[in-house]
Regions:
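Polytopic transmembrane helical bundles with strong interfacial aromatic enrichment
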Residues: 1-277
Length: 277
C-alpha cells in the first residue's frame, strides 16, 4: 500500500514484475551451465579412457554437450539485457544499485564467468578441429579469432567506476580511469558481447565444416556472400556501438542496443550453406 506494507499473498510475492525476465534468464543460463558441466566431464573421461570405443563415446558426448552449451550461451547475454531493461523499467533506483551501486562488482564477477565460458567453449572447438584432417584450411584464422575474443572479453568486464582508496583516487585523478573509463559503459560492453557471440558462432561454423567440402557450382559466390554478411554485420555493430554510444544523446545510446542484437541474430540465423574458405 501507500505506506510500503505488502498485503498480498504468497503468489503475489512470487509472481511480481520481474517474474518472466528472471525465469527466462535463469532457464537459458541453466542450460548453458549444464551443457558446460557435461562437456567438462566428457573431456575428462575422454582423456582418461583406455579403450578406443570409450574415447569415441566421450568424444560424441562432448560434442553434443558443447553444442547445447553454445546454443544456450549465445542468447544468454540478450536474456541478461532483457532482465536489466525490465529492472530499470520497474525501478530506476534498483537498476542503478545493480549496475553502479553495491551490486556493481557482482556484475563484474558475472562478466568474468560469462567471458570464461565463451573462451572455454571456443577452446573446445579449436581442440576438436585439431583432430579433424580438413581443419588445416581454417587453422591460420584461429589466432585472429582468439585475439578478437580476448579483446572483447577484456572490454566486457572492464568496470566503469572503482571503489578506490584515497591514494588511488588521487593517483587516478577521479573515480574514472582517463583512458579505460570509456570502456566501462554499456555501449562498449554491448559491442564487445556481440563480437563475442559472432566470433564464437564463426568458430562453431569452422568446427562443423572442418571435414566438409562444398561441391555446388555456386560455392565461390556463396562463400563471398557469407564473408560479406559477417563483414557488414560487424561493421554495423561497431557503428551502432561507437557512434550512437559515444556521439549521440542517451536516448539513441540505449536504443542502439536493439539493432545490434538484431544484427547478431541475422548473422546467426541465416544458415550458411557452403564452406567459408
Amino acid at each position: 500500500d501507500a505506506s510500503g506494507v505488502f498485503s498480498g499473498d504468497t503468489w503475489s510475492a512470487i509472481h511480481y514484475y520481474l517474474w518472466n525476465p528472471i525465469n527466462i534468464h535463469r532457464v537459458v543460463a541453466t542450460v548453458a551451465y549444464g551443457g558446460s558441466v557435461v562437456g567438462a566431464y566428457a573431456a575428462f573421461k575422454f582423456l582418461s579412457a583406455q579403450k578406443q570405443e570409450e574415447r569415441a563415446h566421450y568424444d560424441w558426448m562432448g560434442y553434443n554437450a558443447n553444442f547445447i552449451a553454445i546454443a544456450a550461451l549465445l542468447p544468454l547475454p540478450f536474456a541478461g539485457y532483457y532482465l536489466t531493461a525490465e529492472i530499470y523499467a520497474y525501478s530506476q533506483q534498483m537498476g542503478i544499485t545493480l549496475m553502479g551501486g553495491v551490486f556493481a562488482w557482482l556484475f563484474i564477477i558475472q562478466a568474468v564467468l560469462i567471458g570464461a565460458l565463451f573462451l572455454s567453449a571456443n577452446y573446445y572447438l579449436w581442440c576438436g578441429m585439431g583432430r579433424s584432417e580438413g581443419a588445416y584450411r581454417y587453422n591460420p584464422k584461429i589466432k585472429y579469432i582468439a585475439i578478437v575474443l580476448v579483446g572483447a572479453f577484456l572490454v566486457w568486464f572492464t568496470p566503469h567506476t572503482l571503489v578506490p582508496t584515497k591514494s588511488e583516487l588521487k593517483g587516478l585523478g577521479g573515480p574514472h580511469h582517463k583512458d579505460l573509463g570509456a570502456l566501462g559503459i554499456m555501449p562498449a560492453k554491448n559491442t564487445a558481447v556481440n563480437f563475442l557471440i559472432v566470433f564464437t558462432y564463426l568458430s562453431f561454423l569452422f568446427y562443423r565444416r572442418s571435414n566438409k567440402i562444398a561441391t555446388v557450382s555456386w560455392a565461390a559466390a556463396g562463400n563471398a556472400a557469407q564473408i560479406a554478411l559477417f563483414a557488414a554485420g560487424l561493421i554495423n555493430i561497431t557503428i551502432l556501438g561507437v557512434y550512437y554510444g559515444y556521439f549521440t544523446n542517451t536516448v539513441y545510446k540505449v536504443a542502439a542496443s536493439v539493432p545490434q542484437v538484431l544484427t547478431t541474430l541475422v548473422i546467426s540465423i541465416l544458415p550458411p550453406t557452403t564452406t567459408i574458405r
